[in-house]
From Swiss-Prot:
Belongs to the LysR transcriptional regulatory family. Residues 25-44 bind DNA. NCBIfam families: PRK10216.1. This is HTH-type transcriptional regulator YidZ. PANTHER family: HTH-TYPE TRANSCRIPTIONAL REGULATOR LEUO-RELATED, HTH-TYPE TRANSCRIPTIONAL REGULATOR YIDZ. GO terms for biological process: regulation of DNA-templated transcription.
Length: 319
């Protein structure tokens, strides 16, 4: 028999979403500012409503049942639509708007000053929160914790970062494509040698730990050639790798997007760029499509539409 929504306390759905996110009664209670006992009672009501355990206890926390997993996306969509409904007056007035972004750095650092000025000009009392793009950023977009993401994906056929592998709930727009360059200190000894693959591999490399991986399409291309680079240093972002590559006393080299030349000029880093020593077919596998990502439920959200247009315009002007 179909149950009526009028018989369900909608606060229980908020509790259910937080339990799914936290996988812990105690942590969910903390976020709701209630006691763990109150959350346990809510979970009991939810189990009775759905006639399913929803979660089972494990040594690692609460594990969702198959039914709970099947409801996760619908629940996130429902909560996001509820937030948009409550935020409706903010689309008529600039007061109180929040902008939540997840972006690759230094890409955001190049444009953030101009972007923030545009946001505050249009929405004077808006607040902005920017987080670095990370392995869980797509999930944050799905959960409604991030309005829009801005990051590079990959083109190598074997990459797990292909645009074609994005979740169906994610919409995207490619703003520009970038072929990474090799960045070396101005007095680096490699600059006195013929620039070829042997020279490129002769020196130690700085790598980026990207979405919990120290390797990327470059390493796949090298593997296909039966070659390998020596990764001597792994860092969390491109700005750190460029900073280290510019320091004296070592022979480290960095590979970073071509757009980083704007970042280097801004910070006056003494770096010289060289092309990746590969043929055209190999370089095609290394192209990085820099992409805006948002949830489909936000495709017609006025705030997100405006933000996408603002970032698009800035990219054409600055990159």
């Amino acid at each position: 028999m179909k149950k009526s929504l009028t018989n369900l306390d909608l606060n229980l759905l908020l509790c259910l979403q937080l339990l799914m996110q936290e996988r812990s009664v105690t942590k969910a209670a903390k976020r709701m500012n209630v006691t763990p006992s109150a959350v346990s009672k809510s979970l009991a009501k939810l189990r009775a409503w759905f006639d399913d355990p929803l979660f089972v206890n494990t040594p690692l926390g609460l594990a969702p049942t198959p039914l709970m997993v099947s409801m996760e996306q619908s629940l996130a969509d429902w909560m996001q639509m509820g937030n948009q409904l409550l935020d409706k007056p903010h689309h008529q007035t600039p007061r109180g708007l929040k902008f939540e972004l997840a972006a690759e750095s230094p890409l955001m650092m190049i444009m953030f000053n101009s972007l923030s000025q545009q946001i505050y000009q249009r929405y004077p009392q808006a607040t902005i929160k920017v987080r670095n793009w990370d392995y869980d950023s797509l999930e944050a977009i799905t959960r409604g914790e991030v309005d829009i993401g801005f990051t590079g994906r990959e083109s190598h056929p074997r990459s797990r970062e292909l645009l074609s592998l994005l979740p169906l709930a994610i919409d995207f727009e490619v703003l520009f494509s970038d072929l990474p360059w090799v960045w070396l200190r101005e007095d680096h000894p490699a600059l006195r040698e013929a620039w070829d693959l042997d020279t490129f591999l002769r020196y130690p490399h700085i790598s980026i730990c990207w979405e919990q991986s120290d390797t990327w399409a470059l390493d796949d291309v090298l593997q296909e050639m039966g070659r390998k680079r020596h990764i001597a240093l792994s860092l969390p972002g491109f700005e750190q790798s460029l900073f280290m590559a510019a320091q004296p006393g070592h022979t480290l080299i960095a590979t970073a997007p071509r757009y980083c030349q704007h970042y280097n000029q801004l910070h006056q880093l003494p770096l010289v760029a060289r092309p990746l020593p590969f043929d055209a077919q190999q370089r095609e596998k290394l192209m990085v499509p820099f992409t805006l990502l948002w949830h489909k439920r936000n495709s017609h959200n006025p705030k997100i539409v405006w933000l996408r247009q603002a970032i698009n315009t800035l990219c054409r002007r600055l990159i």
